[in-house]
Swiss-Prot record:
Family matches, as Gene3D superfamilies: Ribosomal RNA adenine dimethylase-like, domain 2, Vaccinia Virus protein VP39
Gene name for this UniProt entry: rsmA
Keywords: Cytoplasm, Methyltransferase, RNA-binding, rRNA processing, S-adenosyl-L-methionine, Transferase
Catalytic activity: adenosine(1518)/adenosine(1519) in 16S rRNA + 4 S-adenosyl-L-methionine = N(6)-dimethyladenosine(1518)/N(6)-dimethyladenosine(1519) in 16S rRNA + 4 S-adenosyl-L-homocysteine + 4 H(+)
Family per record: Belongs to the class I-like SAM-binding methyltransferase superfamily. rRNA adenine N(6)-methyltransferase family. RsmA subfamily.
Organism, as annotated: Shewanella halifaxensis (strain HAW-EB4)
PROSITE patterns to which the protein is assigned, alphabetical: RRNA_A_DIMETH, SAM_RNA_A_N6_MT
Protein name per Swiss-Prot or TrEMBL: Ribosomal RNA small subunit methyltransferase A
Length: 267
């Protein structure tokens, strides 16, 4: 049997499917998620239910978002899960997570995410951060390093700034390729993201912050002065107390927020 086949399902490359099969890793992730009935529990990409089954076993209801129609059908007929699941068949990148919000409950979101959509999905989920208690995701290790990076490091970039603006970021564990079927070509890791209830550095326009950081990191080897010359003058940098000769990866999250707020105030 091909190593792409697990529990009778052939992994689809276009969906980025790698199914988690290591019981020890699964148990550690479920422990980190800490499922309960006090939150709206949401899984993205349940796949063959490696996390779905142990999470659902201890709660009354689990909401899942799955793109693959074949996997949706498996879940709908699952002997144990079918009565506990609320299944949404569709693309998580386009899914409106606000529809899952309950007045008295925050969401806990988790999943073994397809690596080919992990970065855009992070940006999509940040839009709903005010309704999320925490998130636990299996990601490519490189993406977890980018999420948790410090200024001045190679991994520090646009994703770092936006993730750390919205959330506390904590790596949980590293997961080698042998824990999956089929094994991915890269190492994986689990990350915990806890959205701030009160942002340490409030931003007046988050879209502006996102656009400014994208512009700043478009050319990493060039200086802030060069990359942001359409937005900020030397006088602006001086007023902010930011050295315009620095490169984008040398600037802290709070400094990016200060720059975005300054541009907003100039409008």
């Amino acid at each position: 049997m091909s190593n792409k086949v697990h529990l009778g399902h052939t992994a689809r490359k276009r969906f980025g499917q790698n199914f988690l099969t290591d019981e020890n890793v699964i148990n550690r992730i479920v422990g980190a998620i800490s499922p309960d009935n006090d939150h709206v529990m949401v899984e993205i990409g349940p796949g063959l239910a490696a996390l779905t089954e142990p999470v659902a076993s201890g709660i009354d209801k689990l909401i899942v978002v799955e793109l693959d129609k074949d996997l949706v059908e498996r879940l709908q007929t699952h002997p144990v899960l079918k009565d506990k699941l609320e299944i949404h068949q569709g693309d998580a990148l386009k899914f409106d997570f606000n529809q899952l919000v309950r007045e008295d409950k925050q969401m806990k979101v988790f999943g073994n995410l397809p690596y080919n959509i992990s970065t855009p999905l992070m940006f999509h989920l940040f839009e709903f951060a005010q309704h999320i208690e925490n998130m636990h995701f299996m990601l490519q290790k490189e993406v977890v390093l980018r999420l948790s990076a410090s200024p001045g490091t190679k991994a520090y970039g646009r994703l770092t700034v936006m993730a750390q603006y919205h959330c506390q970021v904590m790596p949980v564990l590293e997961v080698p390729p042998g824990c999956f079927t089929p094994p991915p070509k890269v190492d994986s890791a689990v990350v915990r993201l806890v959205p701030y209830k009160n942002k340490p550095w409030p931003c007046k326009d988050v879209d502006l912050l996102r656009n400014l950081t994208t512009t700043a990191f478009n050319m990493r080897r060039k200086t802030l002065r060069n990359n942001l010359k359409q937005l900020l003058s030397d006088e602006d940098f001086a007023e902010l107390g930011i050295d315009a000769t620095l490169r984008p990866e040398q600037i802290r999250v709070d400094q990016y927020v200060a720059m975005a707020n300054h541009v907003f105030d100039k409008k």
